[in-house]
């Protein structure tokens, strides 16, 4: 369409670069979507778990299917790594942990916090990518301790196998963080406090929504 505006009689399009150049010439803004680029790295020698979700992220009830992942946020004095577990039923945040490193204990603490807040998580499926944090013995032992079933991306580690979690992080970082704050002007400690406040607000919104659903069921 941009090329037709430039030349109504039509032209041959040799490449996407031509489209972007013409869009720039006529003042149309082009913002390509970022391609998923996972920060976790797989341990090729580690034992992998099966993909139990197979991209079916819909859940019929709470604490049935969950997804987890790590995201990184740049700060003034380094990077903060944030790990969370989301419920596929309503996208609620079940557990959260933050560290300045990506060791397996980060994911273990996420499980600890999720189970502490939701003991009924026992028996749930928690899906992740094949990063070494999730194939570590530390993480597997935590899953076993809480009776949680592990699921992982299919062979090849395609990002779409954990698309629900990827989209949750992308939305949170874009709408609630980067559009409002310059994270690189904050220290990791200040950023940690800010993220806790953001997730606290999300939890309050989720509780309000649950109350509305409960009330409407009795109307």
Residue ranges: model-predicted function:
Residues 1-61, 159, 216-219:
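Basic, flexible linker segments flanking DNA-binding modules
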Residues 1, 19, 23, 53, ...:
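Mobile genetic element proteins and their domesticated derivatives, centered on retroelements
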Residues 74, 78, 96-119, 135:
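Active-site beta-loop-alpha junctions of metal-dependent nucleic acid enzymes
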Residues 55-94, 100-102:
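An active-site-proximal beta-strand-loop segment
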Residues 39-42, 128-130, 136-139, 152-174, ...:
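RNase H-like two-metal-ion nuclease catalytic core shared by retroviral integrases
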Residues 90-96, 150-153, 178-180:
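Short small-residue beta-strand/loop micro-motif enriched in glycine and branched aliphatics
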């Amino acid at each position: 369409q941009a090329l037709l505006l430039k030349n109504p009689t039509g032209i041959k399009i040799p490449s996407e670069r031509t489209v972007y150049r013409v869009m720039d010439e006529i003042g149309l803004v082009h913002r390509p979507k970022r391609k998923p680029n996972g920060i976790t790295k797989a341990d090729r020698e580690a034992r992998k778990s099966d993909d139990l979700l197979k991209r079916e992220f819909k859940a019929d009830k709470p604490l049935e299917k969950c997804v987890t992942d790590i995201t990184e946020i740049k700060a003034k004095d380094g990077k903060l790594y944030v790990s969370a577990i989301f419920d596929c039923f309503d996208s609620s945040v079940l557990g959260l942990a933050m560290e300045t490193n990506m060791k397996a204990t980060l994911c273990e603490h996420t499980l600890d916090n999720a189970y502490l807040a939701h003991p009924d998580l026992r028996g749930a499926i928690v899906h992740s990518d094949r990063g070494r944090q999730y194939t570590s013995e530390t993480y597997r032992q935590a899953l076993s301790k809480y009776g949680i079933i592990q699921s992982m991306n299919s062979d090849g580690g395609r990002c779409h196998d954990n698309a629900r979690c990827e989209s949750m992080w992308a939305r949170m970082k874009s709408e609630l963080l980067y559009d409002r704050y310059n994270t690189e002007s904050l220290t990791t400690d200040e950023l940690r406090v800010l993220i806790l406040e953001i997730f606290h607000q999300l939890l309050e919104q989720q509780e309000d929504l649950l109350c509305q659903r409960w009330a409407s069921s009795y109307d």
